[in-house]
Regions:
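Histidine/acidic-residue-rich catalytic or RNA/ligand-binding cores of hydrolases
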Residues: 134, 186-193
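Alpha/beta enzyme core
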Residues: 28-88, 92-147, 165-170
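Single conserved hydrophobic/aromatic residue that forms the stacking wall/gate
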Residues: 1-12
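Hydrophobic alpha-helical scaffolding
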Residues: 25, 66, 95-98, 102, ...
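Short beta-strand/loop segments at the ligand-binding rim of alpha/beta enzyme cores
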Residues: 14-21, 83-90, 145-155
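Glycine-rich phosphate-binding active-site loops on the catalytic face of alpha/beta enzymes
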Residues: 51-53, 170-187
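Small-aliphatic-rich amphipathic alpha-helix that forms the alpha element of a beta-alpha
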Residues: 153-179
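A mid-to-C-terminal "edge-of-domain" accessory segment
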Residues: 196, 202-308
Length: 308
């Protein structure tokens, strides 16, 4: 109802509700596992299962053998698939696991693939993977895995969006992220940046250009609902994303918009703003005065008086 009241009802209608939970417990049959059976009771068509990719987590967190961890991944996926559900397998800590033991991390993916997962999502759960590593690792995974891939990036190194876009360029068909980058620690990859980059710059349709025009409104709406301060410096949808302060910048934008803007603000539902400060020049003052005096020019004496 809230979305409908804002004219954003179509955003909800296009979603696929997905139940989310872990693989079965170690040394537990899938049919006897409470988590898996609860997921099935959700009656969602799609179920996301997460499992361990890192030897450290299998041995020290699950406290099971590496062999049992591989089995529980395959068994859990196969059990859900046998009930006619689509499985999205989230390979938790995949990149850390790959860097610690490449062969084992790939083996866990193959287990999920054998179980029948539709998509294998490579998760940078700790957010420590750099873009240079991302490309190399995804390419290697593609050489060994035939199932479609997804990406789940965290922003602990400040590169969650970059890593997500690299994965898409290399063939990932699903991007897991959050609007406004909400999430654990430093947040998840920000969909408010990923979506316009895909649709406007990379010629990859995520929600379509028409829907992208609602992006800022949706971002503000979510901030209100979450009761979280809206970051005005957010790329694309922040109030300062297209705000200009320096006199030379403003003069340039007024002459040729893209001289200091990478896209048109209205493409994402934002707007251009000129800020008045001690750095302002005549162009800034003219832009403000034209709201009341449409014909005023930079050489008008009034502009000089305001600057004084």
């Amino acid at each position: 109802d809230l979305l409908e009241s804002r004219g954003l009802g179509d955003v909800y209608k296009r979603q696929k509700i997905t139940a989310f939970g872990s693989t079965r417990r170690a040394n537990n049959a899938p049919e006897d596992d409470a988590t898996l059976n609860t997921l099935l009771k959700s009656e969602t068509k799609s179920i996301a299962l997460f499992g361990k990719s890192w030897t450290l987590h299998a041995l020290e967190v699950l406290r099971t053998s590496l062999e049992e961890n591989v089995s529980l991944i395959e068994d859990s996926v196969a059990y859900i698939v046998s009930h006619g559900r689509e499985v999205v397998y989230d390979a938790e800590h995949f990149f850390d696991g790959y860097k610690a033991d490449r062969g084992y991390a790939l083996e866990t993916l193959m287990a999920a693939e054998r179980g029948g997962a539709r998509i294998l999502v490579l998760c940078d759960t700790n957010g420590g993977t750099l873009p240079s590593e991302m490309g190399r690792i995804v390419e290697d995974v593609k050489a060994h895995i035939g199932t479609e891939l997804g990406i789940h990036a965290h922003n602990d190194s400040g590169v969650g969006v970059a890593n997500s876009l690299i994965a898409v360029e290399l063939g990932a068909v699903q991007v897991q992220g959050t609007f406004n980058g909400y999430g654990e620690r430093c947040g998840n990859a920000n969909l408010c940046s990923i979506i316009p980059n895909l649709d406007l710059k990379m010629e990859r349709t995520s929600i379509g250009r028409e829907k992208v025009q609602q992006l800022m409104e949706f971002s503000l709406f979510l901030s209100e609902v979450a009761n979280v301060y809206h970051d005005h410096r957010q790329p694309f949808v922040g109030e300062s994303a297209f705000a200009h302060k320096g006199g030379a910048h403003i003069d340039g934008v007024m002459k040729v918009a893209h001289s200091f803007e990478h896209i048109h603000p209205e493409w994402v539902g934002n707007e251009r703003r000129f800020l008045v400060s001690d750095q302002s020049g005549g162009a800034t003052i003219v832009s403000k005065l034209r709201r009341f005096m449409p014909d005023i020019e930079k050489g008008d004496p009034l502009v000089g008086k305001v600057l004084e």
